[in-house]
Amino acid sequence: MPLFFYKRPGLVVYVTCGDPDLATTRAVVLAAIEAGADVIELGVPFSDPVADGPVIQRASERALKHGTCLAQVLTLAAEVRQHAQSTGLVVFSYLNPLLRMGMEKFCLVARHAGVDGVLVTDLPVEEASEYLRAMKANDLAPIFLAAPTSPDARLKRIAQASRGFVYAVSRTGVTGARQKLADDAQKLVRRLRRVTKLPVAVGFGISNAEQFAEVAKFADAVVVGSAIVETIERNRGREAAAVGEFVKKLSAVSPQP
């Protein structure tokens, strides 16, 4: 199914799969969907997550200790898809795990698992031709990161290569919840609107309902990642319930048809 935001602002929830274990991840994802998440980003743990801040780095370390791998993430996606037909599922990964599996095999397995899109955080659009061919052949949506520092020509190229939505990075640097959002985020969304009609989702640093509401004024969707992972980290034994409560607060923010 295509990625689609049924309400505005849409809510994209990121989880690191396998933290603290895959069964808990499954419960957390289903709780987030029930609480109102439109799209779930299934994070593939990686040993060198250079784009991630300390919260997601710790989550990756915990998941890798249990041996969580890309194949298990795709199995998890298939299980989630059985319970949630209309929720967007995006695999969020560094490039190396995909290359180890093989790009063609990954795309084929992802499609059969019910995955809608893929975001490869360290794959520049300029080097993505083979990846884009495999994605197109399997009707998967490639999603690229657009940064405030990107020149207009590069934003246009990113927008042209993306399907589903464009992920606008609210600021430069690594992921992680922040108390204040950069003004660059709104400017970046305006720039993207000039080159694409795709929905624009803003992420990196949104950690509470107030920030969600602020970003929702100018973005089509809001991505919440580190704050979700930190909620899991702080609520051992009740991860799914805690995430469900947090997502409900976010979902209640000024919905617009």
Language-model regions: role of each:
Residues 190-198, 207-257:
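Alpha/beta catalytic cores of nucleotide-metabolism and tRNA/nucleoside-modifying enzymes
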Residues 13, 32, 40-43, 110, ...:
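Conserved, mostly hydrophobic/aromatic
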Residues 11-27, 88-102, 141-150, 178:
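Active-site mouth loops of central-metabolism enzymes
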Residues 2-5, 22, 47-58, 65-78, ...:
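Active-site-adjacent beta->alpha loops and helix N-cap segments on the catalytic face
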Residues 1-15, 77-82:
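N-terminal amphipathic alpha-helix/helix-capping segment at the start of soluble metabolic enzymes
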Residues 37-47, 113-119, 124, 168-176, ...:
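Glycine-rich phosphate-binding active-site loops on the catalytic face of alpha/beta enzymes
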Residues 11-15, 40-42, 89-93, 118-120, ...:
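Hydrophobic faces of well-ordered beta-strands that scaffold small-molecule active sites
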